[in-house]
Amino acid sequence: MDFTALFASLNPTFASVSHCGNWIASLSRSGHVLIRNSETLELHHVFLLNAQFIQKVVYLLWKPNLGAEKCHQICVASVDKVFVLDIVQHDYYASIQCDQDPLSSISWSPSGELLLWSSFDSKITVWSLNTQKGYLLPHVKTNVSKVYALHPSMQFCTILSRFNGSDCLQFYQISKKAWILLKECKLPTIDSTGIHWSPDGNWLAVLENVLDAVVYIYHRTGLLFHEYRPNRLIEVGFSDFEWSPFGKYLTLCSYHDSTLHLLETKTFSIVFRLHHCLQYTNTDLEMHIWEEKETIYEQQMTYQKVHKLRTDFPEPSFCSASKIRFNCDETYAATITSKYPNVLWLWNLQNKKLHTVLIQKHHIVYFEWHPGRPDLVVIQTKIRKESKIPSNATFLYFWALSWNTPRVVGVPKKGFNIQKVQWLQPSEFSSRPVIVICGEDAYTVAYIVEDEDESFTEVTQTIISQEVLDNELETTQTISIPS
């Protein structure tokens, strides 16, 4: 893997990649918003905000692409103040004061409004940058991970709300001028925990609370189409649910035994189940088990092929949450479960079999497929403080179907503690997969090579230099934003 130099960033926003993949934004301690071209990594846009405000910033969010219009606005926000900056119209900016009602979260709508979540009340403020006005969406459910769902192709949003002791779905037509409530329907749920549109926009899945194993499927018109309950006895419900990229499968993650139920999306009947268990062995030629090994004296970490899964994991709890990620063409899926938090399971969805198991030394905190290459996945693990591996050895793990073995890659910078990773969208300018790796106060861009012998990065190349940044700031126009 080839690494670029280090570029300045701040915790907890780190670096933010635009949806179009053209820009990488980060913050500096001096109050600068630094925006680089993701291809050349040259500094193209610089905004100067109040340095004290920058130290409080917790959100750095690019506006999504609106049709043919590429993303050109970015939201920089703390819990009590929001700025919107524009890299095309440098003299434009917007600020929203929220100190009377601090934010618990913030996001963009598909039509370009800001959704501001209140810390004090169950409401969302929809803020229009065009009209410079905000309006409230009341009775929004709190403490729910998927409380709203944006339709993938039409300009409307579904909100999960609760009032008078009942769950409701609210369908809003969204535009740059206003959000109009089109329809409201009462749900049969006791306490719904999430909603999610299918990729084709025809179906809306509504998940019941974890004590009841049921999922309701609504048509886009708001009519209840199907109610799925497993045929076998399940003492508790589902911890999560996910659609595959093209909508072929709806996956339900059982909280009872960490089994994943895959439903086909014509009749919403069960197709097959993915079982997380320790009985698999690699005696089958199609099955591969790799375990991470550490060599302290050589300061290396590698994967070794093993005959069977370890059985010395801590005794799992009765209930286990699971997560699933599909690759971009729906041929493979990666899963983890809190039952065995050190293990990543890779499933071949074409023959409905387990293909590969990766056993890590530490708990997996993040895993994601490459957005354009269907056989490549990255894994990030939590490094324990009591680990004997030197502090410079913070690693990322990669698996690709075309490789002979999985790979362990360490950032060649002493003390670089990986906090966040993000794939770059495939680009016509680069045939190699590209990933942004963020540390606590800097980030680097890494390029994956097929042959590890072709990769070479000097440690001196990854030393962050304030002098280099100062020179870049001198040659790049800085736009000062009033505080």
Curated annotation (Swiss-Prot):
Highest taxon above the source species: Eukaryota
SMART domains: WD40
UniProt repeat feature WD, residue ranges: 96-137
GO cellular component terms, semicolon-separated: cytosol; microtubule organizing center; mitotic spindle; mitotic spindle pole body; MWP complex; nucleus
InterPro entries given in the database record: Centrosome-WD_assoc, WD40/YVTN_repeat-like_dom_sf, WD40_repeat_dom_sf, WD40_rpt
GO biological process: microtubule anchoring at mitotic spindle pole body; mitotic sister chromatid segregation
Pfam families: WD40 (PF00400)
Keyword terms of this UniProt record: WD repeat
Name listed for the protein in its UniProt record: Uncharacterized WD repeat-containing protein C32H8.09
Organism: Schizosaccharomyces pombe (strain 972 / ATCC 24843) (Fission yeast)
Taxonomic lineage: Eukaryota, Fungi, Dikarya, Ascomycota, Taphrinomycotina
